């Protein structure tokens, strides 16, 4: 089986321009242009070869959302609130912190903001299925080491700062409930509490100084 001569082919801080695709028949990896399509692999009934990665199942909804979010980003985030714009400008400011946020982190929070704040005309044909419950459920996915807790902090800051500024806007909330899958994770997520200086909002400069007082008016509860 032919291997990969250059494993890292993209910058962690920009949208991927290429990806590796595995060809089972040729038992080789092919470098293809563009971002890897969203999807997952499942083992087929005849998948007993050690090098058979299984059947690829595309996530068409995600692949429709991605170019919409990209176009919205490049257009300057039309439709967002003043608070959201301040946060986005702050997060995109390369001089605001030693290390910029990863592309996957910005893409995740931008997608959630787009689904919530972008004009309805931009979301025609994008229907997020409901599970029938009382709450709207949205999901983002990041790999191990991708900075999921940081994205959670960005999400919390976006919600709380908007709700405090626009208390009548039902799209936002200043109360955050986090359920952790165990005591260890619960302990690690204490960095999402908004009080004090030993939190991610301060460590990663997620909230500009002018919005910090608004963040402190929110309440975060973490349990397991």
Q: Can you describe what each PLM-predicted range is?
A:
Residues 1-224:
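RecA-like P-loop NTPase motor core of helicase/translocase proteins
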């Amino acid at each position: 089986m032919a291997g990969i001569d250059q494993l890292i082919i993209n910058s962690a801080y920009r949208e991927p321009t290429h990806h590796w695709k595995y060809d089972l028949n040729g038992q080789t990896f092919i470098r293809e242009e563009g971002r890897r399509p969203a999807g997952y692999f499942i083992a087929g009934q005849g998948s007993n070869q050690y090098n058979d990665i299984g059947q690829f199942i595309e996530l068409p909804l995600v692949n429709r959302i991605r170019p919409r979010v990209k176009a919205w980003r490049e257009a300057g985030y039309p439709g967002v609130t003043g608070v959201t714009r301040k946060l986005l400008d702050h997060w995109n400011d390369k001089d605001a912190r030693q290390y910029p946020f990863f592309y996957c982190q910005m893409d995740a929070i931008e997608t959630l903001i787009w689904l919530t704040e972008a004009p309805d005309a931009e979301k025609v044909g994008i229907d997020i299925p409901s599970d029938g419950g009382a709450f709207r459920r949205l999901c983002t996915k990041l790999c191990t080491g991708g900075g999921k807790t940081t994205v959670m902090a960005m999400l919390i800051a976006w919600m709380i700062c908007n709700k405090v500024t626009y208390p009548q806007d039902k799209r936002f909330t200043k109360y955050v409930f986090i359920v952790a899958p165990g005591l260890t994770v619960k302990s690690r997520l204490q960095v999402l509490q908004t009080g004090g200086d030993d939190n991610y909002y301060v460590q990663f400069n997620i909230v500009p100084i002018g919005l910090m007082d608004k963040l402190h008016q929110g309440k975060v509860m973490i349990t397991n």
